[in-house]
Amino acid sequence: MMVMKRPSLRQFSWLLGGSLLLGALFWLWLAVQQQEATLAIRPVGQGIGMPDGFSVWHHLDANGIRFKSITPQKDGLLIKFDSTAQGAAAKEVLGRALPHGYIIALLEDDNSPTAWLSRLRDAPHRLG
């Protein structure tokens, strides 16, 4: 007959701590894998009009780049993508397709886990 030993409090705390650590690492991995990207297109000067959303859609579609949305904003367009790779590809395509006079920039999402990690890394920590 086999007698089962009851786990000690120390073993239980190690098990709980390890489970929490694995859960946090899994959450971080998922968050990094699902990184959205936003591309902003703005005219350089006052005399240049905002690019047409349909023409932007046409250039992206012709190059096989999928996007989530195109939104007009005050002085430009915001285009959302599922990944940073799609955003970088769109920046390259639109840089060639649009006439000179536009600033095309990838924006970092302030709520993304990588943005939070970079803030923690770059912020000075004072201990003691």
From Swiss-Prot:
GO cellular component terms, alphabetically, are: plasma membrane
Q: Which residues lie on this side of the membrane: Cytoplasmic?
A: 1-11
Membrane-topology descriptor: Single-pass membrane protein
Among InterPro entries, the record links this protein to: Modulator_MzrA, SecD-TM
Location(s), subcellular? Cell inner membrane
| The keyword Cell membrane is assigned to this record | yes
Transmembrane spans? 12-32
Q: What is its main location?
A: membrane
Residues in compartment: Periplasmic: 33-128
GO molecular function terms attached to this record: protein kinase binding
User: What keywords would UniProt list here?
Assistant: Cell inner membrane, Cell membrane, Membrane, Transmembrane, Transmembrane helix
How is this protein organized at the quaternary level? Interacts with EnvZ.
Q: Name the job this protein performs.
A: Modulates the activity of the EnvZ/OmpR two-component regulatory system, probably by directly modulating EnvZ enzymatic activity and increasing stability of phosphorylated OmpR.
Family, per entry: Belongs to the MzrA family.
This chain's protein is named Modulator protein MzrA
Which organism was this protein described from? Klebsiella pneumoniae subsp. pneumoniae (strain ATCC 700721 / MGH 78578)
Gene designation: mzrA
